[in-house]
Amino acid sequence: MSCASEVQAQLFTHPVQIIYACVQTVLFLATIIGSLLAIVQLCKKTTIPDSTKVLLIGALFFANAHELAYFSSPFKVFKMNLFHTNTSCYPLASTLECIPTTTVLAMGISGNMLIQSALSIFRLLATIFPVCYSRMRALPGVVLLFMVLIPSFLSYSWIRSDIVLDDYQMFCSQWSANISSRANTYLEYCSYLTVAHIIINALIILRNRSVESKCRFDVQQRYLNSETLKTTQTICYLSIAQFLAMFLYSGGVLFMRKNQKNIPTLIYINVIVWVYAPPYACVSLAPLILFSLWNLKKQRQIRIQSITVQKETQEDHIRKLQLSWG
């Protein structure tokens, strides 16, 4: 067992760390409760395709996995402040002992990124083959989710491959100093991947709007393109939220590390923990899904109401058809 240095010992009991632990506890509980509510709503009959539901539930699983692993940090802060009696030695965690926690943590981050890729791929294929994909129901989502699970679970093993983990750290939710450069590269790739998701989904939205306007008299095709358009917009909003969180994290960490020499150690560590943005992305996922479901339902009700309320004569209908045909 290794004991914390004087600065590290101060961090365990510092008011900023206690406040941060309380905030992370709230985020942890909010993520779990929000995810349960989102899953209940997703399981109800909605206009969202079954495959998209499967992938969104998968995204919630990865978000909760990340939060469960990351909660080990505030839990240790509370434990050190409430039950630790030997103030002369605050124990540090061995990176070898922390492998299970860090594996789940990396799985949560990777899973959320790769789920965005799976959602983008599914929306792209649904745009190209709308009728075929509407008949396959949940099968594409199950296959894509399985393809996401394996690399997500192995991501930390790849990051720490051929590197000896023989150091100690304050929390198991921290990356080992021996793999910090690889971890930074990995998170940068996650940010680039999220940008690609936004671009792909924006292109899919433009494509579906174009196709929808061209097939106004093909009721089935127009309906399929309309559903794909609405679902793709929802996925794009989720990708933007992920991007903002990863941008805050990668940009903030890069700024802090470049100016680390000019910042006292105690202040540096107390500030940089707030820049760790994945918990913000995780807690925002369920509210975004719930809002998207509510918005889709509201839009559908408005369309149905406009059709049922609007009254027109046969002459008005023929006149509209003549105008639309040019």
From Swiss-Prot:
Membrane topology per record: Multi-pass membrane protein
InterPro entries given in the database record: 7TM_GPCR_serpentine_rcpt_Sra (IPR000344), Nematode_rcpt-like_serp_alpha (IPR051080)
TM regions (residue ranges): 18-38, 55-75, 102-122, 139-159, 186-206, 235-255, 271-291
Gene Ontology BP, a term: detection of chemical stimulus involved in sensory perception
Family matches, as Pfam families: 7TM_GPCR_Sra (PF02117)
Main subcellular localisation: membrane
Superkingdom to which the source organism belongs: Eukaryota
Any GO CC annotation of this UniProt entry: membrane
SUPFAM superfamilies in the record: Family A G protein-coupled receptor-like
The entry's keywords: Membrane, Transmembrane, Transmembrane helix
Topological domains annotated Extracellular: 1-17, 76-101, 160-185, 256-270
Protein name listed in UniProt: Serpentine receptor class alpha-12
Gene that encodes it: sra-12
